[in-house]
Amino acid sequence: MAQESQHGSKTLYVHPFDNETIWEGHSTIVDEIIEQLKENDISLPRVKALVCSVGGGGLFSGIIKGLDRNQLAEKIPVVAVETAGCDVLNKSLKKGSPVTLEKLTSVATSLASPYIASFAFESFNKYGCKSVVLSDQDVLATCLRYADDYNFIVEPACGASLHLCYHPEILEDILEQKIYEDDIVIIIACGGSCMTYEDLVKASSTLNVS
C-alpha cells in the first residue's frame, strides 16, 4: 500500500476491527435480526441474550451500535465469548483498563488480537455485557460436533459462540437466569474459512480432545 501511494495511486486502509465504518457495517446484522423476529411474530422480550465471539472487538462494537440504534442495548445482554490464550477483553475487564497481550496462543486465530478496541471495552462496561472464556479443547470439540450434526465446517472462532448452544448451562450461569423453551438466544455464527476438517482433527488430536 505504501509503495502504491508513492506512485500516486489512491489508497485506503481500513482497520479490521477498530474502525467506525466497520462497526456500522456489522451493526446492520441487528437490523436484520429484528426484521426476521417481526416476520416470525417473535416479540423482543423473548430475546434473552445475543452471543458473539470477540477478538479485537469489531463485530462486538457493531452489534452494540445496532442494539443502541434500536433502543435495545440496555434490554438485550450481549455475551462476549473468547478463548483462553487470546482473551484480551476478559483480561482487560479484570484489570479495569485495556491491556495488550504480548503472546497469543489460542487455536482460534481469527480472534487473536493483542488489544481490544477502546469503544468495545467502554461499551462492555456501559451496557452490562457478559464475558465468557473457553478452552481450546472445548471449542474444538464443539467444531467437530457441529460438523457431525450439520455437515458444515466452522473454525474455532465461530465454535466459541456455538459452544453455548450445546452447553446452555454456561449461558444460564453467566446470565443468572433460567433459559426456557420459548426463550430466544441469538448466536452470531461468524467465520469458517480458516480451517478444514483435517485441521480440526489434527488440532484436536494435539490437544487430546476426546
UniProtKB/Swiss-Prot annotation:
EC nos: 4.3.1.17
Keyword Transport applies: no
Database matches in InterPro entries: Ser/Thr_Dehydratase, TrpB-like_PALP, TrpB-like_PALP_sf
Pathway participation: Carbohydrate biosynthesis; gluconeogenesis
Predominant location: cytoplasm
Catalytic activity: L-serine = pyruvate + NH4(+)
Subcellular location: Cytoplasm
GO biological process terms held by the UniProt record: gluconeogenesis
SUPFAM superfamilies the UniProt entry points to: Tryptophan synthase beta subunit-like PLP-dependent enzymes
Domain of life: Eukaryota
Record protein name field: Putative truncated L-serine dehydratase SDL1
Organism, scientific name: Saccharomyces cerevisiae (strain ATCC 204508 / S288c) (Baker's yeast)
